[in-house]
């Protein structure tokens, strides 16, 4: 830690306080995440340190790079590249009645997918994607932050400040208690973020797990074994769930053209095995008119 100076506290992440800092010799500005773990007394589990060390190898233009892992007084500090703005703050800053430019929505979605495909190809899941951990710079680049932390530290039910961790972007298989899940959980989250890029509003903003599920069911219909084999045997599936009929996504998501709605519907397919993959999503016709500069990144 002696290599870094803390400049100021910039926020509270899922796992602890985040500081803006500076490397004393290079002058590089960094984000310093102090990780608070549930079992403080025992120090940091070696499994977590192993997991985190692997993340230093995830180098991609759309991934916030982990530059250093430091221990101080049995506290773990993760040193990341610094970006000053997250997607939630940016969406909140757009004036009422105005929306993000449709070409920027497309560019951001493409970049998010590029980042996720890179990580998925290295068998790393995110599991907790949301606008707060998508960081943007002033050059139109968006980067995914906090990759792999869920596996290293688990996802707490509450942030250490007792704020509830958001469920809005969580996939139905996770909400229904599936013990086995994989890369499609991230695609679902990206689908809900895609809708929010277009509308500025969260697509499904539940305030509890059951409310979250019911909001999804009201929009997309209550799933059963016909549309999603085995769903009825998932741990938290109840035969007493109200049976909603599928509605139309277009009524929930204005501002997306036909191709955009088609891609969104493929990202929000109930059956994880049928949900579009990141790689397939990048080749969807929605991106046909995207600037080649972005495709080359």
Swiss-Prot record:
Changing residue 4 to D/E: Constitutive polyubiquitination. The modification Phosphothreonine is found at residues 14, 141, 161, 222. There is a cross-link at residues 6, 9, 20, 139 (Glycyl lysine isopeptide (Lys-Gly) (interchain with G-Cter in SUMO2)). The keyword Oxidoreductase does not apply. Induction: Follows a cyclic expression; during interphase, accumulates gradually following G1, S to reach a critical threshold at the end of G2, which promotes self-activation and triggers onset of mitosis. Induced transiently by TGFB1 at an early phase of TGFB1-mediated apoptosis, but later repressed. Triggered by CKS1B during mitotic entry in breast cancer cells. Down-regulated under genotoxic stresses triggered by PKR/EIF2AK2-mediated phosphorylation. CDD domains: STKc_CDK1_euk (cd07861). This is Cyclin-dependent kinase 1.
């Amino acid at each position: 830690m002696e290599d870094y100076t803390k400049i100021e506290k910039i926020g509270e992440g899922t796992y602890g306080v985040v500081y803006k800092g500076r490397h004393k010799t290079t002058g590089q500005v960094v984000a310093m995440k102090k990780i608070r773990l549930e079992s403080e007394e025992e120090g940091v589990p070696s499994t977590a340190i192993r997991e985190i060390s692997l993340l230093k190898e995830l180098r991609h233009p759309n991934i916030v790079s982990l530059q250093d892992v430091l221990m101080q007084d049995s506290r773990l500090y993760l040193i990341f590249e610094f970006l000053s703005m997250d997607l939630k703050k940016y969406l909140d800053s757009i004036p009422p009645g105005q929306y993000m430019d449709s070409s920027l929505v497309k560019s951001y979605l493409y970049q998010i997918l590029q980042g996720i495909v890179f990580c998925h190809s290295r068998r790393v899941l995110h599991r907790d994607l949301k606008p707060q951990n998508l960081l943007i710079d002033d050059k139109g680049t968006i980067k995914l932050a906090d990759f792999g932390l869920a596996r290293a530290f688990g996802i707490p039910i509450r942030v250490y400040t007792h704020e509830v961790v958001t469920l809005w972007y969580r996939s139905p298989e996770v909400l229904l208690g599936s013990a086995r899940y994989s890369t499609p959980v991230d695609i679902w989250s990206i689908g809900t973020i895609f809708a929010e890029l277009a509308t500025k509003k969260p697509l499904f903003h539940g305030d509890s797990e059951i409310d979250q599920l019911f909001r999804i069911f009201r929009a997309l219909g209550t799933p059963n074994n016909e549309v999603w084999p085995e769903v009825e045997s998932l741990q938290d599936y109840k035969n007493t769930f109200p049976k909603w009929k599928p509605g139309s996504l277009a009524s929930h998501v204005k501002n997306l053209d036909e191709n955009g709605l088609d891609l969104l519907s493929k990202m929000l397919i109930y059956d994880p095995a049928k949900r579009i993959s990141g790689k397939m999503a990048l080749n969807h016709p929605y991106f046909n008119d995207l600037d080649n500069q972005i495709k080359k990144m």
